[in-house]
C-alpha cells in the first residue's frame, strides 16, 4: 500500500482547514476549544470520556481545555446521579451564544471558500466527502454519530 497520495491529500486538506485555525475568528480560543464547545452543543450532557473518544485527545489535555471553558463561563458540569465521579457537560447561555457565533462564522467561511464552485461541482465535492467519510468510518468510527 502506497501512502503518498493519502498523506498528500491530508497535507492539502489540513492547509485548507488552516484558514479557520488561527485564533478562531479573532477569539482567544483555539480550534480544539471550539470543537469541544461544538461537540457539547451538539450532544448536551456528553461526558469527558465520550469527548476524548470523539475528538481523539488525551484526558489530561481535555481536562485543561474544559477548565478554561468552565472558567470562562462557557460550560457547566453536572454529576451523573449513578456515578459521582463522572460529569455531564452542558453549554451555559454564554457558551450557547459563542457556539452559535462560531457556527455562523464557520458556515460563512465555507460559503466563501466554495463560492467559485458551481452547483454540479459542489455536489461532486459533497459526494466525494461522504464517500471518504464512509470508507474511513470502517477504520475509525465516530462513536457519537453511530449512537454508541
Segment roles from a protein language model:
Residues 21-61, 66, 72:
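N-terminal helix-turn-helix DNA-binding core of bacterial DNA-binding proteins
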Residues 104-148:
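Terminal interaction helix/tail motif
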